[in-house]
Amino acid sequence: MAVGNFHTIDASRGVKVLLTDEPGDIEICADDNLIEYVRVGIDGGELKITVAPRIHAVPSEQILVRVPYNGNIRKLEASSAAKIVAKTLFTGRMLEIEASSAARIRVDAQVETCEIDASSSAKVVAQIDADRLEADASSASSILLQGAVQKAVFEASSAASIDARKLVAHFCEAEASSAADIRVYCEQALQSRTSSAGSVSYAGPCSVNSADTSGGSTRGAANNELK
């Protein structure tokens, strides 16, 4: 399938999408009994990759779709156990990442602004270099971050986690609630808000302004937590 003009990739229903720097067309790899049910198409600037509804269960990673990076992608969406793995570096002004319902996204980016949202047991692993990063994790999802940003804004709830110990942030705002956990490395100033057994742990030479209620906690990280 020829590569068209799209700015968003939307993957769902257990498919695995591999973004590469290699030129060429979109390539679908699947067993003969599945390939006819793979749906790949562009609608309103979105490249949608899924499986026909008549297939009730898709075996894990049995469908692989290789997509050449076109330089225009600004949003990645994965849901329903789909996976997006980027083997290319995203650059530009903005990148949005959304993962839900046990989906997985892995990406590296050098952008001005990055927004990450993970929910319902999804996982995002990202190397981010940006001026501003916003990350929101909920409902047992997880976000694992590396890189460097000028300002980071984190929010985690309902047993979700954000691990940013290997992300150097100059300024950071972190809010954790309902047994969620946020771990950060901050160099200048941290504002922390916790409630309902949420926790924020921090490392780095930052000043800390915290507001903890209903069993929430803000604390400096122990040495073994920095690894």
Where are these regions (language model features)?
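Low-complexity, compositionally biased segments
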Residues: S120, S139, K166, V184, ...
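Glycine/small-residue-rich hydrophobic helix-like segments
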Residues: E155-A156, S161-S192
